[in-house]
Amino acid sequence: NTGIGYSALLANTAANNTAVGSNALAANTTGTRNVAFGYAALDANTTASYNSAFGTFSLSDNTTGANNTALGYYALAVNTTASDNTAVGYQALGANTSGTRNTATGRSALTTATTGDDNTGLGYYALVSATTASDNTAVGSSAMENATTGYANTAVGKDAAKQLTTSYGNTVMGFQAGQAITTGNGGNVIIGWQAGQRITTGETNIVIGKKALEENLTGGNNVAVGYNALGDVTSSANTGVGHEVMAVTSTGEANTGMGFRALKANTTASYNTAVGHSALTTNTTGAQNTAIGQGAMNDNTTGSYNVAVGVSAFTTNTTGSENTAVGFEALKAATTADNNVAIGRLAGVGLTTGGGNTILGAAALQTMTTGSSIVAIGLSTLASATGGSHTAVGYQAGLDITTAVQGTYLGYQAGANLTTGNNNVAVGYGSLSTCTTGS
């Protein structure tokens, strides 16, 4: 067969059909390899076979399904009963009934597809209010524009998961990315440009680039990786990773930082950890800090249960709390200290101002400024201490104390050239090592 006009293949009894115009395959019986081009195209073809149909009403109420493809105007116009659909333009899957393997490419794409199955979208309105959705993918323009009712979603560009309703497995990729995902139990992973763009309502977020978790609504188990990372996160189990990391976290929770500006001015704190570059960059307001490298506790505000580990370690912390600082510049000019312990390299370096100090190695209490209950244990120990209630234990012990007060110095060079007196005691090896000047 081929048939060209008016009622075209009017109730033909099969073989290899093609039909071109008016009512095209007008109620063809019994199917086979159909193609039909125009006006009512596959006009209620019965009983189906391998369909294709190109224009006007295209698969116009085809019965009963099979391997459909349809191209323009009303495309899969209310196809019944479905099969392996593809539809390309204008109203694309025009309220297809009932679902199966769908793909639709342009304009209104999955125009209110009914009833779901394996959807893919692609352009302009993409999954335009797919009802009742299924295993969705949607690629461009308005991507998942108000998909209803969700499911295993993926959406790639422009407005990506644009107000997806009602959520589920989400993965979202570009431009306005998570654009206000709605509603719950979404497994979110969201990748670029405006990334988490006010996710609603949260769930298990991981977000990777540009403005990352920008003003996230409402929380979830966040991780966000680059540029503005956890940008104004409100809140939940946060982790950051790079560039501005916690860029003004609001409001706290289980924070971790990691790179460049780490906990950049996080407010209001919680269980912080921050790892590199500027680490706890002027964190506000304190809580259970740990900070590990480069700027470590870079001017942390306001204190709490601090530990800081390397490079500039306790860099001019403000305002104190129960400090420990471990390496290189250790308690570097701590302000305003508290129950200090400092362990290596320059240990107490220029400590300001006091606390329960115990300081263990390298240059130990290196020219303390204003002490407290001081003990300093190894290498240069009290290296040129000025004032305080000393105890010092090993190697150069009281090394050139200035200006001494209570003393006690126990081993190796003990009182090492002590300067200037007070209540000294020195016990071992070099003990009062030709003391200068007594008491």
Question: Which residue stretches match the model-derived regions?
Answer:
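Glycine- and small/polar-enriched repetitive beta-structure motifs of secreted/surface proteins
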Residues: 1-439
